[in-house]
C-alpha cells in the first residue's frame, strides 16, 4: 500500500501567517544581531493591573478548592461584576444570569459568534480598514467576506448610503469596532443608532468590538445604550486594554438571552472555563476607582502620545488630533510610493518598529500606526533616533 503524504486542511490555504507573527521573527533576529529595535507596533499594555487585582489572584490561588474546572458560563461573581461595570460606566442594564457571557479574551468571541450565527457560504460585513481577525476567522469558517469602506473624510464611520446600495440578502453578521482600531475614530451616538436601525431593517446581527472605549476617551460609550440594540446586536468588551490585563485573557460579550444561549452552546463544546482565581481577580478589577482609570487610561497615554505625535510630524505624516485609543494613526506623505518604503526604512535605519496600515485593509495602504504601549522614555528614544535621520 503506497504511503500517502500528510497534507494540511484546505482551510489553511485561505489565510496567511499573521503579520505580527512573521514580522516579530524578523525583529527578534535584528535584536539578536545587537540592533536594539524599539517596538511601537503591538497594542499590548505594558502597565500592571491595579494592586487589588493581583492581590485577589494570589489570595484565591492559595485556596486549595479553587483549582478545579469552572463553569463555562463563568462564575456568578464575575458576571455580576461585568453587569455592574456596564451600569456604572455606560448606564446599560444587563441581566448577569442571561445577558452576559465571559470569554477567554474577546478574540475567542469572534470565533464563537461566527460559529453560532454563520453557515458556510453566508456573507459577513467586515470593515476596511479593520482588525484582521474578523477576516481570517470568517474565511476559515467558510464565510464570504464583504468589505465595507471606512474613510478619513467620513471620520472612519460606516457610509450607510453606500451600505444600502449593496446586495445584503446573504449577509448574516456585520463587524464594527468603535472606538475604532486602527484609525482611532471615536464612537458616535448617531452611528450607533444607525447601526441598530440597519441591523433591524436587514435582519443582520451587528457585533461591536469595544475594547478601546476608555483609552484617551473622556466619554466611554456602548452600542447597547441605544434602545432595542440588544434585540439585534452583540457587544464585546475586554479587560486587556482598559485594565492592563492582556495576558489574563478575560473578555465578555453582552446581548439578549437567546443569543447568549447560542454562543454558550458553542463555547461549552470548545473550552472548560477559566481559572477561578482569574475570574475573581477580574471581578475585583472591574471595581477599580475612577482615579485608577484616569491615571492608567487617560493621563499616562496622553503623556506618551505627545511623543508619538512628534514622530508623526518628523516623518511628515498627518493625523487627526481627536482620535482616541492606544495607537496613533497617521497618513504618510505623497513622496512615498508605498507605506512599506517608509516603515522598512524606519525599522532598518532608525531601528524602530511601527505598523504599516496595509495589514488592516486596502484603505490603510497610505497610513502608519504607532503604538503607545511603551514607556515614555522609550517613545522619546524612538523619536530621537528618527530625528537623527533625514526624511
Give the residues covered by each predicted segment.
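PLP-dependent enzyme catalytic core of the Aspartate aminotransferase-like
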Residues: 146, 164, 336, 345-354, ...
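Active-site phosphate-binding strand-loop segment of PLP-dependent enzymes
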Residues: 146, 150-221
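Conserved PLP-anchoring active-site segment centered on the Schiff-base-forming lysine
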Residues: 116-138
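Conserved core segment of the aminotransferase class I/II
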Residues: 228-299, 306-315, 389-391
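N-terminal small-domain helix-loop-helix segment of the aminotransferase-like
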Residues: 2-105, 112, 285-288, 390-391
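A short helix->loop->beta-strand "cap" motif at the edges of active sites that frequently abuts
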Residues: 122, 143, 201-205, 230-231
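Helix C-cap/helix->beta junction micro-motif
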Residues: 141, 201-202, 315, 350
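Conserved glycine-rich beta-strand-loop-beta hairpin in the small C-terminal domain of fold type I
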Residues: 283, 299-309, 319-331, 364
Amino acid at each position: 500500500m503506497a504511503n500517502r503524504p500528510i497534507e494540511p486542511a484546505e482551510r489553511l490555504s485561505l489565510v496567511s501567517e499573521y503579520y505580527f507573527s512573521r514580522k516579530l521573527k524578523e525583529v527578534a533576529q535584528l535584536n539578536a544581531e545587537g540592533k536594539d529595535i524599539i517596538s511601537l507596533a503591538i497594542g499590548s499594555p505594558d502597565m500592571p493591573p491595579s494592586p487589588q487585582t493581583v492581590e485577589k489572584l494570589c489570595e484565591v490561588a492559595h485556596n486549595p478548592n479553587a483549582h478545579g474546572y469552572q463553569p463555562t458560563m463563568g462564575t456568578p461573581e464575575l458576571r455580576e461584576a461585568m453587569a455592574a461595570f456596564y451600569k456604572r460606566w455606560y448606564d446599560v442594564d444587563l441581566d448577569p444570569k442571561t445577558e452576559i457571557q465571559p470569554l477567554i479574551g474577546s478574540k475567542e468571541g469572534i470565533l464563537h459568534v461566527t460559529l453560532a450565527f454563520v453557515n458556510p457560504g453566508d456573507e459577513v460585513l467586515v470593515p476596511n480598514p479593520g482588525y484582521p481577525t474578523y477576516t481570517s476567522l470568517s474565511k476559515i469558517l467558510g464565510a464570504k467576506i464583504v468589505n465595507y469602506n471606512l474613510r478619513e473624510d467620513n471620520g472612519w464611520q460606516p457610509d450607510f448610503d453606500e451600505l444600502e446600495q449593496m446586495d445584503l440578502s446573504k449577509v448574516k453578521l456585520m463587524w464594527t469596532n468603535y472606538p475604532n482600531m486602527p484609525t482611532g475614530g471615536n464612537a458616535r451616538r448617531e452611528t450607533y443608532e444607525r447601526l441598530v436601525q440597519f441591523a433591524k431593517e436587514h435582519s443582520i446581527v451587528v457585533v461591536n468590538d469595544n475594547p478601546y472605549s476608555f483609552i484617551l476617551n473622556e466619554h466611554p460609550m456602548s452600542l447597547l445604550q441605544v434602545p432595542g440594540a440588544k434585540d439585534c446586536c452583540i457587544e464585546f468588551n475586554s479587560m486587556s486594554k482598559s485594565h492592563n490585563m492582556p495576558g489574563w485573557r478575560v473578555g465578555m460579550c453582552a446581548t439578549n438571552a437567546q443569543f447568549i444561549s447560542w454562543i454558550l452552546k458553542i463555547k461549552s463544546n470548545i473550552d472548560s472555563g477559566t481559572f477561578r482565581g482569574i475570574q475573581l481577580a477580574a471581578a475585583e478589577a472591574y471595581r477599580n476607582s475612577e482615579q485608577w482609570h484616569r491615571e492608567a487610561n487617560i493621563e499616562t497615554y496622553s503623556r506618551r502620545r505627545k511623543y508619538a505625535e512628534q514622530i508623526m510630524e518628523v516623518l511628515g505624516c498627518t493625523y487627526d488630533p481627536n482620535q482616541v485609543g492606544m495607537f496613533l494613526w497617521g497618513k504618510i506623505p505623497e513622496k512615498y510610493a508605498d507605506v512599506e518604503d517608509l516603515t522598512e526604512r524606519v525599522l532598518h535605519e532608525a531601528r524602530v518598529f511601527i505598523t504599516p496600515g496595509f495589514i488592516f485593509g486596502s484603505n490603510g495602504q497610505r497610513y502608519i500606526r504607532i503604538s503607545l504601549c511603551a514607556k515614555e522614555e522609550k517613545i522619546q528614544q524612538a523619536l530621537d533616533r528618527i530625528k537623527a535621520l533625514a526624511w
